[in-house]
């Protein structure tokens, strides 16, 4: 886009001086958030596709706009076609979300089972007892024993869990969640695609946004990216920049921020080391102030668009302002129109000059 003075607006995503490449976007309905996401994807694709280091992406399409056949012409902006769209209603996602522990020590499986048990407990709002959580951890370990360490399935997990229940005919919160995951058949039993070396759009609008299935899809796909991260070589580096391999983009991200989402936290914390980055978009700036994780503190670029309401403490934290400067920024946010955003800018303070510590950008209209 452009700054108010007509100068081209750019974000330095892969410079050596950039500590991380995470981007968070807050904008209410009608703020132009979807177009901004499209512009960002188009930019990193068009600038990299003809180089030895193309930047790929995975987009969780909660609203179904990017995967809508009526919007198929959008895809050409990203150098992809409809084969990139993954619809879990029509076919399982073409990979297993579970780790392969073939030849690995049992202690690694024990640690992983606790992590997976915590995940299933976290994505469901129902009350889950400590006994149920422990039973699930044991079920995951036993499922891996049956596969000799190869990736398990939700069905195998369910069977092992039910074998440990006092009354297997009566569902508890865990077995109910597992049955939903088995019934929806969300994942293949083996990897048929490489998530990092391709571009994919996961169609999410068929599921309730705050429901178990939608949360499970995002959680376990991000968990899969963490598994891939462990096996990746470090990214290419030169004197000026580092390689960015992949962006994971979560629109309507607030549904994934209200519980302890460990894979997402891990990817944000260490993904940069191997060129894996995150873009989170949500409707309200409050969403990124999770009690589980401070997303603002870990984002290089908070992009603030038109807001339904403005949280004073968030503004103060992002821009480090008080008094008149705080009131100026708050007024600027309140006056934002569709397709406009403000971004923190430390140029003046670094030069020791008084002036605005933010800039307004008019985003290019793409879709």
Regions found by a protein language model. Name each.
Residues 41-56, 60-276, 289-291, 324, ...:
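P-loop NTPase motor domains
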Residues 282:
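H-loop/switch region of ABC-family ATPase nucleotide-binding domains
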């Amino acid at each position: 886009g452009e700054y108010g003075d007509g100068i081209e607006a750019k974000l330095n995503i892969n410079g050596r001086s950039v500590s991380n490449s995470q981007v968070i976007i807050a904008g209410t309905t009608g703020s132009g958030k979807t177009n901004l996401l499209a512009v960002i994807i188009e930019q990193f694709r068009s600038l990299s596709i003809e180089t030895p280091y193309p930047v790929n992406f995975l987009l969780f399409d909660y609203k179904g706009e990017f995967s809508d056949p009526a919007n198929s012409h959008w895809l050409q902006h990203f150098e992809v076609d409809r084969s990139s769209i993954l619809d879990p209603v029509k076919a399982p996602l073409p990979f297993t979300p579970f780790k392969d522990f073939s030849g690995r020590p049992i202690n690694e499986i024990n640690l992983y089972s606790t992590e997976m048990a915590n995940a299933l407990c976290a994505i469901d709002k129902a009350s889950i007892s400590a006994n149920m959580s422990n039973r699930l951890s044991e079920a995951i370990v036993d499922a891996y024993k049956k596969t000799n360490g190869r990736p398990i399935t939700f069905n195998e997990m369910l069977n092992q869990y039910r074998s440990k229940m006092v009354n297997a005919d009566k569902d508890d919160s865990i077995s109910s969640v597992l049955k939903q995951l088995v019934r929806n058949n969300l994942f293949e039993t083996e990897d048929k695609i490489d998530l990092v070396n391709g571009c994919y759009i996961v169609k999410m609008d068929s599921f309730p946004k705050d429901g178990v299935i939608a949360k499970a899809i995002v959680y376990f796909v991000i968990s899969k990216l963490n598994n891939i991260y462990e096996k990746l070589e470090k990214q290419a580096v030169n004197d000026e920049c580092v390689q960015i391999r992949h962006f994971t983009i979560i629109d309507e991200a607030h549904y994934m921020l209200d519980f302890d989402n460990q894979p997402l936290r891990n990817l944000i914390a260490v993904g940069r080391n191997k060129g894996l980055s995150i873009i989170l978009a949500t409707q309200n700036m409050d969403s990124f102030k999770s009690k589980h994780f401070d997303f603002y503190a870990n984002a290089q670029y908070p992009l603030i668009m038109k807001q339904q309401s403005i949280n004073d403490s968030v503004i103060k934290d992002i821009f480090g302002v008080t008094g008149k400067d705080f009131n100026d920024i708050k007024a600027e946010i309140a006056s934002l129109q569709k397709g406009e955003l403000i971004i923190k800018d430390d140029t003046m303070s670094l030069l020791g000059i008084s002036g605005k510590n933010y800039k307004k950008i008019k985003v290019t209209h793409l879709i």
